Amino acid sequence: MPELLNKTKTNLNFENIKILIKKFQSPFWVYDSNIIHKKINLLKEFDIVRFAQKACSNIHILRLMKQKNIKVDAVSLGEIERALVAGFKPNSNEIIFTADLFDEETLSKVIDFKIPVNAGSIDMLEQLGKLSPGHHVWLRINPGFGHGHSKKTNTGGENSKHGIWNPRLAIPIIKKYKLKLIGLHMHIGSGVNYKHLKKVGQAMIEKAMEINEKILFISAGGGLPIPYTFNEKPIDTKKYFIIWDEARKKISRFLNTPIQLEIEPGRFLVAESGILISQVRAIKKMGDKNFVLIDAGFNDLMRPTMYGSYHHVSVVTKDDRNIHETETIDTIIGGPLCESGDIFTQKEGGNITTRKLPILKIGDYLIFHDVGAYGASMSSNYNTRPLIQEILLENNTFRTIRRRQKINELLNLEK
């Protein structure tokens, strides 16, 4: 949930932001490790917490997770390599590879390091089984329905590419190659509510009974929402656990075997820990519309453009002048890209909206809240713009965990 900079008890406050602004070139990301620790503690009832690193894959964030005994999910060869560099062990359940297909290079690496595979297609099982009989596998099941904060984050149902539609068809392949089925996984999308959660839990029970094979784990997947606006309520993690624990117990009784309950949060652990600091570089009027243009674009923060996502915005003035919060104007916030869609105030489908902001000056700073998930990890080099710096606040100090990329580093790839 966004917190006012002058009232927050976190390290993401006015004083620290002003220090960082003086020291580092905007735009840049900032994370507060204390917030991540608190979010981890909310999930301690689950047997296994596995971080969906696609939300924030910085190696230093992964190391922070490992220090707290959090395991990791990887969805690409690059994420496998990140996990290994961060200290997660191969040939164990510390890393699981989740996907709907293998490319040859990734398949080879998964086999070499004996990384368990959460298979989202029958073809994956066939390809893995031929080369690595006995490999540990999960089945990622598409329950036939989905849910998400955006149509683009819905990962269940017949319009989704994710998961195995009929998991019974996987069993002959698993037995043919003597693959070791260790778990069932179900994830229907991001921003799941309790009603959908109960439906997913029941679907997991039905699929486990239908398959009727001994397993060690079930995974609740991810999708735990966070409140991006002031009027949203945080999810009740105890209620979330109870729903899945009931499913686990029913499956355990049916299969007559103990089963561990795993959860795979991404956004929930890191979103509220991060902010994006940007600077106002141009102000102009287009007809009746007021535009404020900043030095960060959708190459940095993609979510508003891709999903129509809302992020609360705070203002820090360059000259410490007092801002009258009641004296606001409707403002469209745009970035520097040569792209009409480079607008931070839009809804899904590209409909432009406004924010009520105080009257700004060139050099003032806009702070985007709750960007620790799918912020830096979704950044690109569009318009040949370098990736920006990432900073971690930890143990009452701050350090760079990714330096600013140089343009020459981009050009050298093409020489």
UniProtKB/Swiss-Prot annotation:
Question: Does the entry feature the keyword Ligase, yes or no?
Answer: no
- Keyword Electron transport in the entry? The reply is no
Q: Which residues carry this modification: N6-(pyridoxal phosphate)lysine?
A: 54
Catalytic residue positions: 338
- GO: which molecular function terms? diaminopimelate decarboxylase activity; pyridoxal phosphate binding
Any single GO BP term: lysine biosynthetic process via diaminopimelate
Reaction equations catalysed:
meso-2,6-diaminopimelate + H(+) = L-lysine + CO2
Q: Which cofactor does it need?
A: pyridoxal 5'-phosphate
- Pathway the protein takes part in: Amino-acid biosynthesis; L-lysine biosynthesis via DAP pathway; L-lysine from DL-2,6-diaminopimelate: step 1/1
Q: Name one Pfam family in it.
A: Orn_Arg_deC_N
Q: Tell me which InterPro entries the record gives.
A: Ala_racemase/Decarboxylase_C, DAP_deCOOHase_LysA, De-COase2_C, De-COase2_CS, De-COase2_N, Orn/DAP/Arg_de-COase, PLP-binding_barrel
Keywords annotated in UniProt: Amino-acid biosynthesis, Decarboxylase, Lyase, Lysine biosynthesis, Pyridoxal phosphate
Residues the entry annotates as binding substrate: 267, 303, 307, 339, 374
* Gene3D superfamilies noted in UniProt: Alanine racemase, Lyase, Ornithine Decarboxylase, Chain A, domain 1
- For binding pyridoxal 5'-phosphate, which residues are annotated in this chain's numbering? 223, 264-267, 374
Give the Enzyme Commission number.
4.1.1.20
Quaternary context:
Homodimer.
Family of this protein: Belongs to the Orn/Lys/Arg decarboxylase class-II family. LysA subfamily.
Q: Which PANTHER family match?
A: DIAMINOPIMELATE DECARBOXYLASE, GROUP IV DECARBOXYLASE
| Its job | Specifically catalyzes the decarboxylation of meso-diaminopimelate (meso-DAP) to L-lysine.
Q: What is this protein called?
A: Diaminopimelate decarboxylase
List the source organism. Answer: Buchnera aphidicola subsp. Schizaphis graminum (strain Sg)
